[in-house]
Amino acid sequence: MPEKPYDHIAIELKWHERWQDAQFYKAEENSAKPKFYVLEMLPYPSGTLHIGHIRNYSIGDALARYKWMRGFNVLHPMGWDAFGLPAENAAIANKVPPRQWTLQNIAAMKKTHRRFAFSYDWDREVSTCEPEYYRWNQWFFLRMLERGLAYRKRALVNWCPKCATVLANEQVVDGCCWRHEGTPVEQRALDQWFLKITDYADQLLDEMARLEGGWPERVLTMQRNWIGRSEGAEIDFTLAGAGTPIRVFTTRVDTIYGATSVILAPEHPLNETLLDSEKKAKAKAMVDSRAGRDPGDIDKEGFFTGHYAVNPYNGEQVPIWIANFVLMGYGTGAIMAVPAHDERDFEFCTKYGIPITPVIRPVDQPAGEPVALPYGEYGILENSGEWSGLASAEARRQMSAYAEQHGFGKSAITFRIKDWGISRQRYWGTPIPVIHCPSCGVVPVPDDQLPVVLPDRIEITGAGRSPLENVPEFVNVACPKCGEPARRETDTMDTFVDSSWYFYRYCDPHNSERPFDPAKIAYWFEIDQYIGGIEHAILHLIYSRFFTKVMRDIGLISNNEPARRLFTQGMVIAEGAKMSKSKGNVVGADLLADKFGADTARMFVLSNVPPEKEVDWREEGAEGTYRFLGRVYRFTTRNVPAQQRSGDADRKVVRKLHQTLKKITEDFETRWHFNTCIASIMELVNLLYAEEQNISAAVMPQILESLALMLAPFAPYLSQEMWEEIGKEGPVFRQAWPAFDPELAKEEGAEIVVQVNGKVRTRITAPFGTAKEELESRSLAHEKVKPFIDGKQVMKIITVPDKLVNIVVK
């Protein structure tokens, strides 16, 4: 048959239309097949897909298609993380309701998803902005409220005076509002709802052992640091002259004789009595100046309160300071500064002239010799009363016990992680299902009144508190307990609540009686492969682990973790630079599909580097991928039906075919180096072109069939077209994955590298186990070697059997 040109537009349109209503990607319930749940993190519906999205989804799709071909029952769903601030901003800018803007974006993105033939089971689609979904956010909140895991307290929040509203931490840039550059963000105290994630801090940390080997070590390290478990002691200094205790937390009680000051957080409750009005204003300015910033990134500043504290171990008085780097949310909000043995304290105390007293020396350093400061390691105590001469570890144990015996301290564990503040003064989020009654206080909305639905008619201006406060029919309700007039909560939930459990809903997306059927979760969970960016390591991936443990304790599920394996894909950059709208270098998915086709885009983002590495989008690279797909298609079409040819190359191409199958199979099962999978297919195609006239009619059909099957995970449109061209029926990715034969994949002989003075000059093939003398003789006589040794003295020959001959001459 004459070869056909590769018309990606015609091929992809043809199969796109045929697949529209097909149910190829439906997961089966209660199947006897082994299950495989593969999931890419659900996207925010921004309206358009770019090449970065395509890479993420192509990784998951390749794996899903491969697992189908290996006989698995595959669950591969997709949904939308649809609540969030961008929709409110669009409503303000364009006078479009957030719901309308969101649904338009979902429709546009879903159309592109379908265009790229990602194998999603769309019957399981969820959108977190639908009442059918966020009803269960509210249900989970009420269960946590019952268990004491949800509570309300007054807390400091970021406040922009120009916006007249609360900002999330991510909306604070260098201490200023993201909308109003140069406008410092203030800290205000507001009543906020929290989820008690700290109750699960130990579990979140300890149960990471189950994830080792399945999750990237970098993610686990980030989570360990974020949870930040510290073992130490809480010690009560006392306010000189008053006896009021000032409890400090320290991990190094062995250094307490070197404490030369006590430092309080600027919002510490004791400041109300310690500070005059001028110093209170100073402390408040400190709080405002660090709003939304990492304390480690700010210049350390402080001031003396004018008061002193008494060290309970030696009775000495030390000054009490206020400093911006001490956090109320960590430990007790008060620290003892030991500048001789802590780098941060050393920097601060040196700046303000606070004394420095060494009390620890290195184990291998004689007593009396000066210590290079700050010395932060363990060592031997000195100048520490009765504990002088003890090693740090033993001193910590004895000194903690002494504090407990004498009633001024105890051993303690503290965590860096704080309870999760979920209140947002926004419209486009899940309403928090409580009612505030003057008589009954905080009253949960009864389950049979869920969902509390967002009102459709609302004006969003971006000013003031929650827009919901301006909707009387939403706010004004009867108390469920006493029936008297009451007010509905107007805060909405952090959108991370939505994404903390969505993967469970995929297993039972249409259940109107409960979040999901536990039996379905028992079948599908844990997620076998979760895929998403490293940027989610310490928010979504911690919150989802927390939700899983709470659901386990409620009795809904039995698994301890949401995902068995996690993969974090690399970023896509464009022409060497990070893609951004401001640079104008965002590569849109639809434009790529128009120019090169969906298959080319999918293949390119997988073909250059391993998927965990950054990939650089370059148009010439996409053109190369497009040419390769064209070569494959033309080779297929001109060899159907197979021609009667010599068959001289049959053994060679069959061997290469089975080597390629072996390579791809092993990569899918282990390291996911899709780039080397695709490279091996390219090598096979190069050989097929070179030996085309020497492949028999008996072997060619096997080659073409295997080629279509190997391409199926990477290029679904082209592989399906090839499958039809060779006379096969049914979806190609539902065929059995071709098995490789280890015997057929074996080389008939070894390839020997021949070098002269360490430089490769040629390669020869010889039967395995060929004697070194014969290898050397053949190498010396080779036409490509002789020009480099003629007229020269052979000093020695280094031979590695089956691998190398290196001729050393001078």
Curated annotation (Swiss-Prot):
InterPro entries: aa-tRNA-synth_I_CS (IPR001412), aa-tRNA-synth_Ia (IPR002300), Leu-tRNA-ligase (IPR002302), Leu_tRNA-synth_edit (IPR025709), M/V/L/I-tRNA-synth_anticd-bd (IPR013155), Methionyl/Leucyl_tRNA_Synth (IPR015413), Rossmann-like_a/b/a_fold (IPR014729), tRNAsynth_Ia_anticodon-bd (IPR009080). Pfam families: Anticodon_1, tRNA-synt_1, tRNA-synt_1_2, tRNA-synt_1g. It comes from the Bacteria. It is found in: Cytoplasm. Gene3D superfamilies: 3.10.20.590, HUPs, Isoleucyl-tRNA Synthetase, Domain 1. Keywords: Aminoacyl-tRNA synthetase, ATP-binding, Cytoplasm, Ligase, Nucleotide-binding, Protein biosynthesis. GO terms for cellular component: cytosol. Its main location: cytoplasm. The keyword Cell cycle does not apply. ATP binds at residue 581. GO terms for molecular function: aminoacyl-tRNA deacylase activity; ATP binding; leucine-tRNA ligase activity. GO terms for biological process: leucyl-tRNA aminoacylation. Belongs to the class-I aminoacyl-tRNA synthetase family. This is Leucine--tRNA ligase. It comes from Solibacter usitatus (strain Ellin6076).
